[in-house]
Structure formats: structure tokens, C-alpha cells
């Protein structure tokens, strides 16, 4: 017969939530840092397409 599992404690729940929030904050900080480097023109770790002018095609 199926028996329900024990309830997860508040401490364990809060710990998991804190880890999840910390990972999200780290990802947001990295994204902001990459965005700043792209805007300032100092980005060298990756390649992104540059806009081409239409005069070359005519």
C-alpha cells in the first residue's frame, strides 16, 4: 500500500531556495558583465555578427 513520504522541513526548503536564488543571481551578474563589455567594445571572448552596410551590395 502506498504511504506518503515525510514532509520536507522548512530549513531544507529554505536552503534549496537560497541555492536556487544564488545561482540565478550569479547568472544575472554574468549576463550584465557580458553586456557591459559588448557595449564598451572590450568583448574578446566570443564572436557576434557585425551589421553590414547596404552600399556594398549595389
Swiss-Prot record:
One of its GO terms (biological process) is translation. Keywords: Ribonucleoprotein, Ribosomal protein. SUPFAM superfamilies: Zn-binding ribosomal proteins. GO terms for cellular component: large ribosomal subunit. One of its GO terms (molecular function) is structural constituent of ribosome. Belongs to the bacterial ribosomal protein bL32 family. This is Large ribosomal subunit protein bL32.
Amino acid at each position: 500500500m502506498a504511504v506518503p513520504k515525510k514532509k520536507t522541513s522548512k530549513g531544507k526548503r529554505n536552503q534549496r531556495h537560497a541555492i536556487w536564488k544564488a545561482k540565478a543571481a550569479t547568472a544575472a551578474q554574468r549576463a550584465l558583465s557580458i553586456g557591459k563589455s559588448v557595449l564598451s567594445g572590450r568583448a574578446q571572448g566570443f564572436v557576434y555578427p557585425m551589421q553590414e552596410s547596404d552600399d556594398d551590395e549595389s
